Amino acid sequence: MPELDILRAELAEIDKKIMGLVGRRNEIAKVIGEEKAKTAAPVVVPSVERIVEQRYIDAGAKTGVTANTAFRIARAVVDESVDVQGRLPRFQEPQSICIIGGNGGMGRWLSNFFAARGHHVSICDPNTEGAEFPVVSLEDGAKSDIIVISTPVTIADKVLADVLEASSDDAVIFDILSVKQPVIPRLRKAGRAGRKVCSVHPMFGPSAASAAGRNVIICDCGSKDAADKAAVLFNVADILRMEVEEHDKAAAYVLGLSHAVNIAFSDALVRSGFTSEALRACASTTFRKQTAVSVEVANENAELYYAIQRENPENDAALRNLEEAVSRVRTLSKDEFISMMQDEAVWYQ
């Protein structure tokens, strides 16, 4: 045992050195990020990331570290560097931005994000407790250059109507709803009338360290000018553009279905009669990977996840597709089952 204690102490020292090196790596990444910010160069450069990944794999081959482990370490340090660089201020021409619902989770995130880029941020929110930015009325907020609607889906259309009525034709207006169907008619009508409207969906939550390397969907609602200006605001992110009518169908799979799979998986485990400790003790590699995602989902905001399931009308089709897929897993013949998995592998390529 004393010998084991000595070896474990040595491992602890090695771990400290590793974390020290990661910290030093972050310091260098920050300096690189500052240089990128000066020229508005992109934070994420896929070709450079591939070089880093291969560098780790090659180094691992010489030190007895498997390629899979080397790749995962590379991704961890690269992702850390991206967040370090993504948090750096990238100042833009200052504009006044009012966030309706700015004291909620994503409202706070957006307020800090825009303020860090040099914009003048105010919020309009009935809940003012702990507000970090000036709180204004909707009428005053509507005088801003940019107005962001960050409210629950259930009241968003009414808020949008009020904002359109109170604001000038020059104001850029967009929502960040996870479900677009309730506001599409009003957004399209406003777009046809020449208003600068679009619809945005950051594909991450308020726990995100930065927007860099993360997806932001910009939906066109008839005003290219508004969509272009929204894209500039989020230009450190990976921008995907689509028509607003396409959004909910895609979201039904990337949000509704992916959430439902993990929630249903966890529910099946809860009702299995096993404790989590018992199943972890005999876990397979796949089970460990699946539960790593499912435990994060289980600890998310249940009210928000309920809303995502219920408020997107396209979710029913996605969940029926899932039900059919589960049925196929249960009933297909051997050859059909193998063919199904082969098709899945091809789809992911």
PLM segments and residue spans:
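An accessory alpha-helical subdomain
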Residues: 240-349
